[in-house]
Regions:
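Conserved N-terminal phosphate-binding loop of PLP-dependent enzymes in the Aspartate aminotransferase
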Residues: 1-381
Length: 381
């Protein structure tokens, strides 16, 4: 029956596309030797938790405050913000947080010799928080000394986003496990991947009866694998990673030039096509009063007065970078052109400039947002 080529039968074999994609993927990741495919970044995190515990025979996991690694139960235990965790406990008992960029806290957390893995984003997605110089390199050294796996979540930063294939390539970091998703298929097909050292996989799948201790039914489906191969071809053929590095640098510099001109804009930071604009309380009286109105409604609401007109007026999609944050995250396409760059700069200049005029249409929008928020929360009639 299987050989009858009937359209209602699924062929029961291993897809050669998975092998081809694994080979192509690892060619961009020196030091990585094995690949496990799954359906999302969250699934990749869950797989990495199991691999790390099996390979080290240790229970504890360490992660950074304000981290985001997904919303399933295991991944949620590594989530650095209570807003996502509250109401879903108890979560994994052996997950411990340390402050971002705090090597002393990490060293103390590793001191007991019972930590399976340290999970870290090379650039934190929530807030686009950059690592201090040497932080990741020293974190690797501390993990090696403690016998702890260094697990890098590159779901947001990987696949060329920062101007390198991996953000950790900027510091030549040799991770034990690397997590990818989203951009691996161009954002169109559910996909995830865990790459890592051979010995970690061998320790986990170490016997015939343990060959199936972890898997995913659709993890290496042909559609996702074909999408991944297509993405790698486009990245290579169109030199999109090089474009992200070059264009991202000029875009960042031009946005940073706005900081001295606008008192609401405190900092612009980023790497490649991963950029954050951070805002803060103004100094002038009229702006302070308007800001206070928004703060009364909910912390961080100001960013919506920038995000909404960027979309409705300029057709630019951005996002508030996290709960109760004054940070807007911009993730332009890696194929960004000079014309696109100019368009983005003009749009931000227009919207941020209008935010500094009181009254204006944007502050009218802010008043509406604040009123709606207060009504929904029961704080306004």
């Amino acid at each position: 029956m299987i050989g009858a080529d009937l359209p209602n039968l699924v062929q029961l074999d291993v897809s050669p596309l998975a092998g081809l994609l694994a080979e192509r993927l690892l060619s961009h990741m020196p030091g990585q030797e094995r690949v496990f495919f799954c359906n999302s970044g969250t699934e990749a995190v869950e797989a990495a938790i199991k691999l790390a515990r099996a390979a080290t025979n240790r229970p504890k996991l360490v992660y950074c405050e304000h981290a985001f690694h997904g919303l399933t139960t295991g991944a949620l235990a590594l989530n650095g913000d209570r807003i996502f965790r509250d109401g879903f406990g108890p979560l994994l008992a052996d997950a411990v947080s340390v402050p971002w960029n705090d090597l002393g806290a990490l060293e103390a957390a590793l001191h007991g010799g019972d930590v399976a893995a340290f999970f870290v984003e090379p650039i934190q997605g929530k807030g686009v928080n950059l690592p201090a110089d040497g932080y990741l390199e020293e974190a690797v050294r501390l993990c090696r000394r403690a016998g702890t796996l260094f697990v890098v979540d590159e779901v947001q930063t990987g696949m060329g986003r920062t101007g390198r294939f991996l953000a950790t390539d900027l510091e030549r970091i040799d991770a034990d496990l690397v997590l990818l998703a989203k951009a691996l298929s161009g954002g169109f097909v559910p996909v995830g991947a865990v790459t890592g050292k051979r010995w970690i996989f061998d320790k986990t799948f170490d016997r015939m009866d343990r060959a199936v201790v972890h898997g995913s039914t659709f993890g290496k489906n042909n559609l996702a694998m074909a999408a991944g191969l297509a993405v790698l071809s486009v990245l290579e053929d169109e030199r999109l990673i090089e474009n992200a590095a070059r264009r991202g640098e000029t875009l960042l510099r031009r946005l940073q030039a706005m900081v001295p001109r606008y008192e609401l804009l405190r900092e612009v930071r980023g790497r490649g096509m991963m950029i954050a604009l951070e805002f803060g309380p103004p100094r002038s009286f009229a702006l302070r009063a308007a800001w206070a109105l928004l703060e009364k409604a909910t912390k961080g609401l100001f960013c919506q007065t920038v995000v909404i007109p960027l979309l409705t007026r300029h057709r630019i999609l951005s996002q508030v970078a996290g709960h109760e944050m004054y940070v807007i995250k911009l993730l332009p396409a890696l194929c960004l052109s000079q014309e696109d760059e100019d368009w983005i700069v003009r749009a931000f200049d227009d919207v941020i400039g209008e935010c500094h005029r009181v009254p204006s249409a944007l502050w009218d929008l802010a008043t509406t947002l604040a009123g709606n928020t207060l009504r929904l929360s029961g704080g306004h009639p």
